[in-house]
Design a protein with these regions (language model features):
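Small-residue (G/A/S/T)-rich helix-start motifs and N-terminal tracts that mark the onset
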Residues: 1-134, 142-160, 165-201, 205
Length: 207
């Protein structure tokens, strides 16, 4: 187990070369947002851009994309149809997965997906998916904890889970107090259970 802080993480970010372009710095495909939770997608896109991704694609419903493009016009839009719950239609999520088969990207999924999360994730995480890595947060973690992604979820080899203490408790089937009592042990158990890298964030509200 390795303890990271903001200084160590900053040192890991590659320096930009003077002679380079956005194609030299990788791609992120974000599946985020829904009619009810639009701001989550904006935060996803901005975070990916600020940490150095060369190309950031957003797969979401049209009203969410319109909002995000007013804040980050450099984002590449992948408009999706809206399902009955106001989220991304699963068939369109499958098309997003297929789009990145030949030119793999990092998948960022979960924030703001709402009740559609499990359907979307099951369309994105299939045996033939070619994601370089995946970062799963928020509603993706709730779907994972509820068993809606199957007994053996098809997570990419380089998957990062970023639960807050409440989400970590749901993933492990324990109380938030148990998570907070020994966060390193909880992170270790999550890593072993889901074969993923784990970052347990600080609580943003009273859990």
């Amino acid at each position: 187990m390795h303890e990271l802080n903001q200084h160590k993480i900053a040192a890991l970010l590659p320096q930009r070369r003077a002679q380079s372009n956005k194609g030299n710095y990788g791609s992120v495909a974000a599946a985020a947002g829904s009619l009810a939770y639009r701001g989550a997608a904006a935060l996803c896109v901005e975070s990916a851009l600020r940490t150095g991704a060369g190309l950031v694609y957003l797969a979401s419903v049209e009203p969410v994309i319109q909002l995000v493009l007013t804040r980050t016009p450099e984002c590449c839009a992948l408009p999706c149809r809206t399902d009955a719950d106001g989220g991304i239609l699963a068939a369109d999520a499958a098309a997003v997965r297929q789009r990145f088969t030949e030119k793999p990207a990092v998948l960022l999924a979960g924030p703001g997906l709402g009740p559609s999360a499990a359907r979307i994730l099951n369309a994105l995480l299939t045996a033939d998916a070619k994601w370089k890595a995946a970062v799963l947060d928020a509603d993706a973690l709730n779907a994972l904890a509820a068993g809606e992604l199957g007994q053996f979820p098809l997570l990419p080899t380089n998957t990062v889970l970023t639960p807050h203490p409440g989400e970590a408790a749901r993933l492990l089937g324990c109380s938030v107090a148990q998570i907070q009592t020994d966060r390193p042990a909880a992170a270790q158990e999550l890593a072993e259970r889901y074969l993923s890298l784990i970052h347990i964030s600080e609580p943003t509200r009273q859990e």
